[in-house]
Amino acid sequence: MYHSLSETRHPLQPEEQEVGIDPLSSYSNKSGGDSNKNGRRTSSTLDSEGTFNSYRKEWEELFVNNNYLATIRQKGINGQLRSSRFRSICWKLFLCVLPQDKSQWISRIEELRAWYSNIKEIHITNPRKVVGQQDLMINNPLSQDEGSLWNKFFQDKELRSMIEQDVKRTFPEMQFFQQENVRKILTDVLFCYARENEQLLYKQGMHELLAPIVFVLHCDHQAFLHASESAQPSEEMKTVLNPEYLEHDAYAVFSQLMETAEPWFSTFEHDGQKGKETLMTPIPFARPQDLGPTIAIVTKVNQIQDHLLKKHDIELYMHLNRLEIAPQIYGLRWVRLLFGREFPLQDLLVVWDALFADGLSLGLVDYIFVAMLLYIRDALISSNYQTCLGLLMHYPFIGDVHSLILKALFLRDPKRNPRPVTYQFHPNLDYYKARGADLMNKSRTNAKGAPLNINKVSNSLINFGRKLISPAMAPGSAGGPVPGGNSSSSSSVVIPTRTSAEAPSHHLQQQQQQQRLMKSESMPVQLNKGLSSKNISSSPSVESLPGGREFTGSPPSSATKKDSFFSNISRSRSHSKTMGRKESEEELEAQISFLQGQLNDLDAMCKYCAKVMDTHLVNIQDVILQENLEKEDQILVSLAGLKQIKDILKGSLRFNQSQLEAEENEQITIADNHYCSSGQGQGRGQGQSVQMSGAIKQASSETPGCTDRGNSDDFILISKDDDGSSARGSFSGQAQPLRTLRSTSGKSQAPVCSPLVFSDPLMGPASASSSNPSSSPDDDSSKDSGFTIVSPLDI
């Protein structure tokens, strides 16, 4: 025990007594302690008052204005209710539990709470309390009468046990839902709803819709209790946020939510569809999901994938169809639980804020469904069946769930909602591949039922082989049938006829065959699938028997017969060797699919850029033609180069890798005798020139010497065809080489030698004398040709 220097203690004095303490110091400490306590009280009072002030301020911001409902709806869609202390009230307003008129809130709340109290009193009964007032011939524990309270009590007990079984599994990672009072609230609310809706009763998954509602109500009640410690809240707050009526308020919100979600839990078919099915024959080549019962939830998820997903991402839609992943596999849980298992609870509440704020019909569910698929689309497209199933059944974590809501809003109405920032998903596909494999293994084990003993299977296969081979052997014996026996007796005679030296070797061989069978995993599968009929026949041919066509009358030994049977089984061992090869092929196919998706994106981008460039180039071209500019010709030449780029992006003009190399080593050569040496002017005076200025607007003049402007700055396109074909006048698609020549009206079109000639470095000197026909991207031609440009200002 530590003592300060101011204290003195007698060795024989007990530790409980304290002596030698200065009374002044104790007084000062006491007075200082009192002052500290007063300071703490003052600070705590200020903190509590500040808490209530902020609480009341938030109440006024949300509910004290004329258009408060639109305000809280916008906050719910924008994700601004995440930290709100009045989220439960907002949900009640979104789901029409509370009226928009605030003056009716108290009366409406009291009415709903009295309604639930009456329901609970009717359905949750104890027959022991009312047994004295009823006929004991009917109301006894052994009575099976429908009007018996005891019979009803046992039926209710069975229903409650089923509900409690699901309630115990509700959010097991959260301590709040493991409390007994919370579990009792969940059970009572679900039981009362089931008894009030006998046509639907209780369906698995309803507890996961009720649990977030109870959690939000509890959080708001705790915030109310904390804020009301320092100040007196209003009567409106006291009534709406009374913690004693948490169960009553939860039932009111849950029952209103189920008004919309009830068809998703119903297993009844549509009445209108039943009449159609009696008249319609099954659809040929229909998918399995289209041939099932027309349940509302199945119709909904099929419509989401077949219409919405197909509209927004046809590639992902085709990939899921190719893998035969029906939307019912994952979509039923997504829609029924309102994505309750796909997000953490705090993110789930943000999603529900947007769903409820959007409207009571929950129309945003369909687009959140599609947005979730688009979020992981790259991972899905590049994955096989197992990995896709793992991704869909165990949805990956999303860092910003609000971006998913914005994506859904954009998909529904892109005109009113801006395009959200692309939020990419970088998955660990190995994890989801393992999860998908686990799901497949679980489904297989559930379908198989009890596991089989491999020893029993091997023994049964051995006996099965004996029965198959032995009856076919007896009729072929040389000595005819055995006297006094049939085929079955002959098999019994053949088996024991072994020498003493033959028995141990056969026993060892039999053990080896059993071990080989145990290692062969595919044999039972082949037998189940009916593939064994290819290898095993009930009436084997002569070639399949030992010895082939040289079969003699002496029957073979038992070991030889078993070898003929197990030789077919041993072939299945090669099946396991090909599994690794198939896995590598699947991974390669996944990579090819992913690269194909990227190529499609690049192709779409190039086409879009070409389309936009074409539009802007035409506009620039029209403006230039209307203005008289000094360097108009240079601008037009630059436009022609841009149009070549546009045609390359569009795909109508072929792009060669040599062009990149030529650009790196680009050199401009000048030849004074270019036109004379190239021979381009020989025999091409007629029908081979097109005016550039006329070709920009239209092919109005095909006469070689005619020009629209008639000056020395006109551009003339000389075609390199030998057949004298007329030039095409659409400048918007012009991609063939250009030549600028000086032309005068009324004169021959013989080319004029220029002192300044630019030779194309891409084509080389041989391009001038080439006779290859020119290409036009409008004709989808992809041939390349050289060109020479002469500036009209330098001529």
From Swiss-Prot:
SMART domains per UniProt: TBC
UniProt cross-references to Pfam families, sorted A to Z: RabGAP-TBC
Composition skew (Basic and acidic residues), residue ranges: 1-13
GO cellular component: autophagosome; cytosol; endosome membrane; Golgi apparatus; intracellular membrane-bounded organelle; retromer complex
InterPro entries: Rab-GAP-TBC_dom, Rab-GAP_TBC_sf
Keyword Signal: no
Record carries keyword Phosphoprotein: yes
Transmembrane segments: none
Protein name: TBC1 domain family member 5
Gene field: TBC1D5
